[in-house]
Amino acid sequence: AMPTRQIEKMIEVMQGLDDRFELDLMLVPTFPGYLEKLKAKSGTDRRIRFIPPVSMEELVPFSNAYDIGLYLLPPTNFNYAMALPNKFFEFIQARLAVAIGPSPEMARIVRQFDCGIVADDFAPATLARALNSLTAADVDRMKAGSEKAAHVYTAENNAEKVREIVTSVLKEF
């Protein structure tokens, strides 16, 4: 868990959600002090749990038991503004509905496949309002959208593109 990713914003989202929602955070304690800060921020809210990490091989199958993958990454720098993080694709491969802020690259995929919701801004309360408006049918539809996206965004489908890019770059040297 890196402080620059502002995971506390996801805890703030929970503070605006109704009782249907729970948040399980699976964090590697890279910065133990930060993890303790997050636990303190979650307070006594029983809907927020810190669960032990699983291996990379287990991550997608484990995550499939959930309904929604939440990822709110404020655009504090160019890389975060244009991010397509592994976590986002893990959610899609797990066939989850995705709930994000308006990060342009993630939002493009979410809208293209109708695999989640995109908040109007990066305020936790805005994403909470969007999540509270969802019905079970909405979530099921979005999970079906992730199923479609998961078949497009695979290593196998993108391997040839990566080879072409690497070959092109190497030719320049």
Predicted regions and their residues:
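Nucleotide-sugar-dependent
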Residues: 5, 55-62, 69-89, 99-108
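C-terminal alpha-helical cap of glycosyltransferases
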Residues: 133-136, 155-173
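A short, well-ordered alpha-helix in the C-terminal region of glycosyltransferases
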Residues: 140-153, 164
